[in-house]
Amino acid sequence: MNLTPREKDKLLIAMAAMVARRRLERGVKLNHPEAIALVSDFVVEGARDGRTVAELMEAGAYVITREQVMDGVAEMIRDIQVEATFPDGTKLVTVHEPIR
């Protein structure tokens, strides 16, 4: 299987998000990369489902809470930017203050 660098990045994010979900199910707090991956995956999948950029910018800020991440992680992540494929093309989605 020949994948483009973009496709490899998408797969890596999806896999990291799966790991993050499993850890949350076990009650383990997420680290920085896991938190980024979980929010990013939410945005990518939401775009595929037909949600709008505005909806994802708002909803992306409520995917995980401060209680679900390790100390200091929420302060480290001010914005998350994700290129997502929507029905009408690829767009950049920015989630401000993604961990509240």
UniProtKB/Swiss-Prot annotation:
Origin: domain of life: Bacteria
Pathway per the UniProt entry: Nitrogen metabolism; urea degradation; CO(2) and NH(3) from urea (urease route): step 1/1
Main location: cytoplasm
Compartments where located: Cytoplasm
Listed InterPro entries: Urease_gamma, Urease_gamma/gamma-beta_su, Urease_gamma_sf, Urease_subunit
Reactions listed under catalytic activity: urea + 2 H2O + H(+) = hydrogencarbonate + 2 NH4(+)
A single BP term in Gene Ontology: urea catabolic process
Disulphide bridges: none
E.C. no: 3.5.1.5
Gene3D superfamilies per UniProt: Urease, gamma-like subunit
Gene Ontology terms, MF aspect: nickel cation binding; urease activity
GO CC terms, sorted: cytoplasm
CDD domains documented for this protein: Urease_gamma
Any Pfam family the entry gives: Urease_gamma
Protein keywords: Cytoplasm, Hydrolase, Virulence
Summary of the function given for this chain in its UniProt record: Disrupting the ure1 operon causes loss of urease activity, decreased resistance to low pH killing in vitro and decreased pathogen survival when inoculated in BALB/c mice by gavage.
Oligomeric and partner information: Heterotrimer of UreA (gamma), UreB (beta) and UreC (alpha) subunits. Three heterotrimers associate to form the active enzyme.
Family: Belongs to the urease gamma subunit family.
The name this protein goes by in its record: Urease subunit gamma 1
Native organism: Brucella suis biovar 1 (strain 1330)
